[in-house]
């Protein structure tokens, strides 16, 4: 019985870098995997659009030919298609020069359609491999029927897919024992694991241990686990395990060279791998795109993310509907409170006074002498925004999300206890004695991805409070390194995908829109330098 390694870095990694690996990387990664004796190399996807050089979204197999140097007869070169997203009429007859095999991935309930696609592919001379996405959704009876269908077709392989990274050992054991018992031994059984619960490598080991003496098997992996969300089982770990424990013959130097030369560069520019958010995806068997949407667009903390995902039905969790998700997010945030008395109290407090907003930017440190002089001279009503700044004495701290509220409470307990706070109702609906709660929907305006920027929300609130003169400090703009922008180096970042330029551009747009809307009723001046200032 054989154990084969299928490296799908160039295919699964395409989720991370939009398939833009570049010609040198593609050639060298394939070459290094060849040198490492990896049995199956997945070169990318087949897609229904024209090929762009240097990407792994191929239109036809010959598009991959320039990247396969010294094609080896001992290696299968594959590409993947979604069962319903590639027109097989475009697929030419197999010529042996590039792609040898095509993997067809299909969702639960679409087995018959996938087999029909597979027949068309095999009729053109290619090997056919199947991927049963979200295999965890299959009942025992479903698994028997799946095996029966595969026995009629006899593909090269059928792979179990832990789509949401939700499997534990008992789940894997249930699935593979039923399939192994019913599946023709001529069909190899594969595993594609995701690392949402840090179990991808462990599941691969269990898979190998369970089946190695009974049938030929295939294990999917990627270099450094490169793949969407929490990523995949890592090629270097799986290859190392097979070498040490199963008499494998993988050249680890070639694998590590591929990582050092190319994957490390992608790791500097892109993010993948285990995180709390993707653990939640695994916990609830939730599509990773839902997690990415909440993280990217709303910087949702783990507690709120769980509440939102729990509010979805099982079926809704497994697909992604961004409009539905946006509505669920707003439902979760928009906890209605009676804030009429709070608004009136705040209006009285700032009546005819200049208001100074102290945002978290580093300029509040570098320009502290100037800012203190302004405070001494003008005696403004001071509101700190989403962070405590111990250089200044404020009248209130304005918090817009639970992450910053809890960080301030836990990091500066004595200062936090001494300060009065203004909270949005997405944090809590009933404030403590020193907390005023304002309705979340009073200050948000939809239509922007990052509509909950704290300074923008503070300015909207001040406009509702009839503030006339507002002075901004620390609204600097975001730099490109983690927390380089903040006065407090440990302040939790709220931009998980590190797209700082895009975030800055959108805040500029939001500020410009707000500035134009309040012109004539509320004057805004910048005390410290800011990329958002309109001059």
Regions flagged by a language model, labelled:
Residues 1-340:
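Catalytic cores and adjacent flexible loops of soluble metabolic enzymes
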Residues 336-535:
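Metal-ion/cofactor- or nucleotide/acyl-coenzyme-handling active-site neighborhoods
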